[in-house]
């Protein structure tokens, strides 16, 4: 269980880091030359949702176990499924792989904390 909690913590921190990069430097993740105003807007919109969810996914399984922690981790996993689907739609293989890995880690931790 400790290894799974550590993996979940790393996954949550990675998700937070990518959200912060997406908010601060959206072109770094979208690989566009100069981000448009809309791209910057959506980068910040993504970060304002992903950072709190990532922090909650990091803290919840460490603070308590049970249905509440499992539900929160399931929500984090669902968000990563969405990110993976966006990766599939845009053929961004690193996004597919990263989001799929984070989905698996959050899901496994959710099952283990019930």
Language-model features and meaning:
Residues 5-30:
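N-terminal signal-anchor/start-transfer transmembrane helix
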Residues 18-22, 85, 89-90, 105-114:
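Membrane-water interface at the C-terminal end of transmembrane alpha helices
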Residues 73-84, 98-110:
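Hydrophobic alpha-helical segments of small multi-pass membrane proteins
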Residues 13-21, 38-62, 74-78, 82:
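Core segments of alpha-helical transmembrane spans in multipass integral membrane proteins
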Residues 25-42:
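Interfacial loop at the N-terminal end of multi-pass membrane proteins
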Residues 1-6, 59-68, 108-114:
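Helix-coil boundary and interhelical linker segments in multi-pass alpha-helical membrane proteins
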Residues 63-64, 71, 82-96, 114:
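Membrane-helix boundary connector in multi-pass membrane proteins
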Residues 40-48, 99-114:
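Small-residue-rich segments of transmembrane alpha-helices in multi-pass membrane proteins
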């Amino acid at each position: 269980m400790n290894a799974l909690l550590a993996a979940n913590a790393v996954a949550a921190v990675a998700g937070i880091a990518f959200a912060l990069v997406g908010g601060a430097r959206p072109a770094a993740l979208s690989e566009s030359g100069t981000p448009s105003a809309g791209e910057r807007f959506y980068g910040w919109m993504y970060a304002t949702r992903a950072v709190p969810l990532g922090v909650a996914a990091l803290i919840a399984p460490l603070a308590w176990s049970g249905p509440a922690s499992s539900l929160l981790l399931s929500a984090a996993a669902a968000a990563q499924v969405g990110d993976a689907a966006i990766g599939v739609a845009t053929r961004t293989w690193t996004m597919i792989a990263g989001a799929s890995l984070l989905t698996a880690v959050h899901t496994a931790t959710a099952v283990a904390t019930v």
